[in-house]
Amino acid sequence: MLGHFKKRGESWYFWVELERGADGKRHQLSRGGFRTRKQAEKAYAEVRDQLRQDSFITPTKTTVGAFLVDEWLPAVRASIRPGTHDHYSKMVHGYVVPRIGGLKLGDLTPGQLNAFYADLLVDGRLHRGPSQPAGLSPKTVRHVHTLLHKALADAVRWGNLGRNPADRAEPPRPRTAEMKVWDLTQLRRFLTRVETNRLGPIWLLMATTGMRRGEVLGLRWADVDLDGGRISVVQTHVLVDRLVIVSEPKTAKGRRSIALDPTTVSALRQYRRLQREERLRYGELWTDTGLVATREDGTAINPRLFSAWFTQHARAADLPLIRLHDLRHSYATAALSAGIPAKVVSERLGHANIAITLDTYSHVLPNMQEQAAEQVAQLILGS
């Protein structure tokens, strides 16, 4: 079983003659897209060994697009959060299918994936604003790679592929962006601005707990214990195809209990009284959702609209514009800077593990080291 190698353009490929099939015809197996002959030889050796061990999987004629849309997306729907499935679907239909969806799944190579990623970096943006570049960011392209790697790994597990071409692909490394947060003075200015706003207590809740947008919008009064000063995060609101749906928290640790400070408890009591007055005023037009954060008629607040309101308040307060999610980062940065143990901050944020907290907010750690050095020295030296 001799392999033949040849360079075509900038890539190497190999082919091997197979035994005659049931139709009596000779068949040929080929693979391409390798950057070096050595890579092609290694891939050939794997195919040769699989053929000898009778473990070779005949390449499927299914296209990449058909596999992702007709098989993979429906199969994983039940095992992932609705918001995640919606995100996957948008990436598949927006980025993958239009560019490499017509390629045969079994013929997909690392080289083709690398070319696909390069194409997205140059001209991948679907909806381009006046000041936006045509290409996607390295971070977004890497998200596409992560999706493809997972989908192709499932294809291998299900017997559609012999190996995962994404294992050897080289997605771009995302640039480390500087985290945008408000300092304590800016946080106070924002809270002063929204203090008289109808949703002022909700903004205060976000600022003093670091809860995610979906967690706050999905919070029910049944999950709030004002007497005990605690709330339980058991569900979240996500936007899927312009519809607000109820989902599980983002991670297992996302299902958690959060202690509230007296000021936030007092603000929520006042807000609940306001909501009850609105219920009486609207009468039969009131919608009893049981939610804490609602519109005046009791209905749920659209997450995108909630973010837009946040931006409006930030502009009105003449504050640096940050995303609503950065309010969560601002809380975490303030808490860590104040010397709150990272484990406690991680638990309040609902991170899957403390390593995520330490990695995300590593910019705060040097100052914490200095504070620790001074405090320990004062304890030991008594000065």
What are these regions (language model features)?
Residues 104, 166-168, 228-233, 323, ...:
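Short functional hotspots where side chains directly engage DNA or cofactors
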